[in-house]
Amino acid sequence: MLAAGISSMRAFLSAVVFSLALLPAASFAEQADGGVQVRKPKLMVVPESVVDRSAGQQYLQMKQQAASRGMLNRDAPQVARVRAIAERLIPQGRRFNAEAGNWAWEVNVIDSPAINAFCMPGGKIMVFRGLIEKLQLTDDELAAVIGHEIAHALLQHGRARMSEAVLKNVGVNLAALYFGLGDLGATALAQAAQLAITLPYSRSHETDADLAGIELAARAGYDPRAAVSLWRKMAAVGGGQPPQFLSTHPGHADRIREIEAGLPKVMPLYEKAAAR
């Protein structure tokens, strides 16, 4: 009886795994009036409302912590500069995500030496002072950074990563049960899943955000070629990197090659915007 039960469970698990394997991870999207081609994640098991609510709470906490330490929006001219660039980029985002026009966008600057910036799901942008000052960014380069981060939100990479984590945990537990590996098996499978699933998706997200980011910049009238000089600056201050296979980001050289390959598709958009 027990053997029959185990056999039935394994048959069920096989069906679950096979069904998940048939689901498309992403589809390609390209704008009707030209531009880059990027992948739009399809395998979404976490509701968008859950992701946006979680991101909004985290963003609010970060703002409150920064404000309590006197680190939020301290340099008025710097904040005005960042917001002016973001305000030109944001309207272009509806081409990649129609819902972006309904987001409650926020743009803030933290007075921290960290070289960092991000855009959370729902349009919550944060730029760190160190990014601007240590790299001595031009407006075009700053637009490349902000455009890249906005692209992550537009393409719902945060939601995709959460969905991947949920599916990975479900899959690991099912596989451990299927193979009778117990806790040790679950741990080993989780580590394998981290390398085999999470990291490749993350690298593809970065590449797509780079490409969508230069298109956003180009359509907003910022020179997309500045993304190349931006990442050369990043490489200069970044020092050594982990082996590319184990990195969640493309290597700087690979990243620059991808951007340069995408420039011919967005330069006409930049020239058109600059002529207006």
Residue ranges and their predicted role:
Residues 2, 27-276:
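A Zn2+-metalloprotease active-site environment signal
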Residues 2-16:
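Bacterial N-terminal signal peptides that target proteins for export
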Residues 7, 25-27:
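Intrinsic disorder/low-complexity segments in short proteins, especially the signal peptide
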Residues 14-24:
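Bacterial N-terminal signal peptides
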